[in-house]
A protein has these predicted regions:
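Positively charged n-region of N-terminal signal peptides that target proteins for export
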Residues: 1-5
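C-terminal segment of classical bacterial N-terminal signal peptides
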Residues: 13-23
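Inter-blade linker and blade-boundary elements of WD-repeat/beta-propeller domains
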Residues: 348-359, 398-403, 452
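Flexible internal linker/loop segments at domain or repeat junctions
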Residues: 384-407
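Ser/Thr-rich, Proline-interspersed low-complexity disordered segments
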Residues: 488-570
């Protein structure tokens, strides 16, 4: 056992040192930092002792306008210096100075939808899912629902340094997304999950609205970022099958993975719901058992609204296990499932399954490695954050590691100083105590218990997750991006003298885009983004660091029996 742990740690350490040396510039370009949606941030400043003394940066302004469900992004390498990108339900997009929190540029894409939707629990609806940035072209991609005579989803591309709309964008999803004769209907489709950029194609996943109203489907739309008129899509055959999780589309770098929810009126014939779906570039889908997995009781899950797709897909590797390349799903049925991502298996038993207690929905999970092994972690509706170990065996098994009570409904994220050491699991008590919390990745011992008066946030929204860059944590909330700092954070880099040239031409922005109803997407004319003068905020008192909480003893987790699911859980 000791030799296997040593081999694992040496391999992992070499891997992460290569990663760190190749990425001296820090950029957080997407949901949960990586395509795998593991939520892992490598930052040498985040030792347990430093994390215990995290404080809010009261000199960081962070003022924005609108409700926030999306994770902020962190972008370096441009003429403005390090930037925070934030998007809101008011269809506002912001670039903020990463040190001061003042506005560098701001765009409004048009009115959000405030009424006329058949159901839902987000109001207004504008930009919900976390954007993605292509560093090579310095382009920012996101989906916005814009009100008008016809309510429509548009996929946008902006120059991340100026806010100008790139040529050929936005893409009218109503007009361009089709699959096997089915057409996209924005009125009943919600876009919650983070966008993914894989090999030059940006992927956007869609669900329905809370309440399961209207003839919605689970959709994945792919747009070629160098030729936005080239649009492909996949959708569930049956109505329903929404892709609900905050992580949206996950990828192993080649294939894309999504998890779908319950479908309707199938007559017992599987039509894409309650499943892990593997999509190839485009997206395209073979329909073969290698490219989908659904549990043998999928029809029962359909009938009781206990979606397999409560949490977005997470790609997970388990060194020493057979199979070792897996994908994780966490459902509203209280279960965790692991399947072989190279051969999903069709309607079949999973590689591993465990009852993990509590309904899991709307969030993202995390995965991480320590010297002790491989873990995944998540927050559930029962008010607990938990971690499970995945054994390096044939086949792998799922074993409870720790579970802690935590008031909120956020998606966790993970920091580590080098990839395997000093692993800390973080979560915000969104729609709960509205504070940050941190736990030892191996034991669950409390490292940070929310701080003092200054560390209280307000207006945090369900499912949301934080982001880490250069010794800081950033978190988006209603009308505000919050910044938290360690006692000795990594200095923020200065601006790059010359901006990287974009791969595509940009249009000269003028007036606010008006959604169009034509069948061909066109480049819209947009307002000239002006840099807001950077005004130094009024200095405020430096917060007193909170005392480091005494770590708690590793809890003993009692396995929970699987209860009968409620007939229709109220909130997705």
């Amino acid at each position: 056992m000791k030799s296997s742990i040593f081999v694992f740690s040496v391999v992992a350490a070499n891997l992460w040192s290569a990663v760190l040396s190749a990425n001296a510039q820090v950029n957080v370009t997407q949901e949960h930092n990586n395509l795998s949606r593991d939520g892992l941030y490598i930052d040498a400043a985040f030792t347990p002792s430093a994390a215990a003394n995290l404080t809010r940066d009261l000199n960081f302004d962070g003022t924005i306008s609108g409700n926030v469900y999306a994770q902020p992004l962190y972008i370096e390498g441009g003429p403005n210096g390090a930037m925070i990108i934030a998007v809101t339900e008011s269809n506002n997009v912001y670039a903020l100075n990463a040190t001061t929190g003042t506005v560098i540029w701001q765009r409004n894409l048009g009115p959000p939808v405030t009424s006329g939707l058949p159901c839902g629990n987000i109001n207004p609806v504008g930009i919900t899912g976390t954007p993605v940035v292509d560093l090579a072209s310095r382009s920012l991609f996101f989906d916005a629902l814009i009100d008008g005579a016809t309510k429509k989803h548009f996929i946008y591309s902006l120059n991340v340094d100026t806010g100008a709309t790139n040529a050929g964008w936005p893409v009218d999803v109503n007009a361009t997304a089709t699959y096997n004769g089915m057409t996209f209907a924005s009125l009943v489709q919600e876009e919650r999950g983070g966008l993914a950029l894989v090999n030059g194609i940006v992927y956007v996943a869609y669900s329905g609205y809370n309440g399961d109203c209207g003839a919605y489907r689970g959709w994945v739309v792919g747009v070629d970022i160098n030729n936005p008129s080239n649009v492909h899509a996949w959708a569930t055959t049956a109505f329903g099958g929404g892709i609900w999780g905050h992580g949206g589309v996950a990828s192993d770098g080649t294939n894309m993975f999504v998890v779908t929810g319950n479908t309707f009126n199938t007559g017992g014939n599987w039509m894409g719901g309650e499943a892990i779906i593997r999509l190839q570039a485009g997206p395209t889908w073979t329909g073969q058992p290698t490219d989908y997995w659904t549990p043998t009781n999928w029809f029962s899950l359909d009938n009781t609204d206990t979606d397999l797709g409560g949490v977005s897909a997470t790609v997970i590797n388990v060194p020493g296990a057979t199979p070792s390349q897996l994908v994780l799903a966490l459902g509203k049925d209280h279960n965790a499932y692991l399947v072989d991502r190279n051969n999903l298996g069709g309607i079949a038993l999973p590689v591993a399954q465990a009852s993990v207690g509590g309904i899991n929905r709307g969030t993202s999970a995390v995965t991480y490695h320590t010297i002790q092994g491989t873990y995944f972690g998540f927050h559930n509706d029962a008010g607990t954050i938990a971690a499970y170990n995945v054994t390096a065996s044939n086949p792998p098994t799922i074993v409870s590691a720790w579970s802690m009570n935590q008031n909120g409904r956020g998606s966790p994220w993970v920091t580590t100083t080098d990839g395997i050491n000093n692993v800390i699991v973080w979560v915000a008590g969104v729609a709960g105590d509205q504070r940050l919390h941190a736990y030892n990745g191996d034991t669950g011992a409390v490292i940070y218990a929310g701080g003092g008066t200054n560390e209280l946030m307000s207006g945090t929204r369900q499912w949301n997750t934080g982001m880490v860059a250069r010794g800081r944590i950033y978190f988006g909330a209603d009308n505000k991006v919050y910044a938290f700092r360690l006692p000795t954070g990594t200095p923020t880099p200065t601006a790059t003298a010359t901006a990287t040239a974009t791969a595509t031409a940009t249009s000269t922005p003028t007036t606010t885009p008006t959604p169009i109803s034509t069948t061909t997407p066109t480049s819209t004319v947009t307002p000239t983004p002006t840099a807001t003068p950077v005004v130094s905020p009024t200095p405020t008192a430096t917060p007193t660091p909170t005392a480091r909480p005494t770590p708690t003893v590793r809890p003993h987790v009692t396995p929970r029996g699987r209860p009968s699911p409620p007939p229709r859980p109220g909130v997705r």
